[in-house]
Amino acid sequence: MSSVTVSIDPHVHSVASYDGHEPVELILEHAAEIGLDAVVITDHDTMGASRRAEAIAGEYGLIGIPGVEVSTAHGHLLALGVDRMPPRRAAYADTIQWIHDRGGVAIVPHPFQRSRHGVRRRDVPLSDGVDRSTGDEGGQGSPAPDAIEVFNAWLFTGYRNRRARRFATSYDFPGVAASDAHHLQYVGRAFTEVRIDGRASVERVTAEDVLTAIQSGTTRVDGRRAPVRMAARHYLTAAEEKSRYYAVRGAVRGVTATVAGTKAAATLGRVGFAQGLHRTRRALSWFR
């Protein structure tokens, strides 16, 4: 059987993320220049830029795959191959099930790193019914993720990556590598090679082929970590940008609520005035 290997960076942020900086066109152009076959835009809780990247990826000779990094109740989760935004703040297992119901692939990003909203080890669902908090077997099991991000380029040391790899190996999860890039020069710094069986050339590979191959585990990880100095700078600026983003978002919501409250008060005032006028007229009618 013929097969072909494609290189994919499944975790990249665009300017649509609160901590991203690059438009999708530049990301796609750069990905093509460095030899990637696909790059998935996985912005935080928004899919507009990712859907655009999917639509125009072919113009750069790339495979278009939509995605998003969704905030669940237990941590971040990558949803690849979905065409709409998953519900936010839902349970991890419920979000995985939502992704599967729509033909997507669920990948655990930067697992166990709580400072980056990574899921705790005990909250990663298994499909074999094992309760890792007690070690008990024979349970119903939960919808399990399709893969674990075992190499993330934005880690200070290799400890978290090694821990993620051990976890994936222990529970037979496929592993992927990703740059988690927020700046153009880091796109593709870590990537995943995916073997696609039954295809003779990259040009014939579809998004569905890539997602199916990830699920089947025909993956190999490659890449290198970002420099420690740049990683430290990224964490500091990302925290500031996140705070600024939510401060602006909160201010907008506050203004919206104030305007809505003012309008409601004005409406109630008009209603009260009309009711009072009506009662006055009725009272005066007794003296006619």
Show the residue positions of the predicted features:
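Short acidic, glycine/proline-enriched helix-loop-strand junctions
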Residues: 51-64
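A glycine-rich, hydrophobic loop/mini-helix early in the fold
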Residues: 66, 70-72
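Active-site flanking residues adjacent to catalytic metal/cofactor-binding acidic residues
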Residues: 10, 42, 68, 109, ...
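A broadly used, surface-exposed interaction patch
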Residues: 91-93
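Charged catalytic cores and adjacent phosphate/nucleic-acid-binding surfaces used
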Residues: 1-10, 14-17, 24, 29, ...
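Divalent metal-dependent hydrolysis catalytic cores, especially in the metallo-beta-lactamase
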Residues: 27-45, 104-107, 145
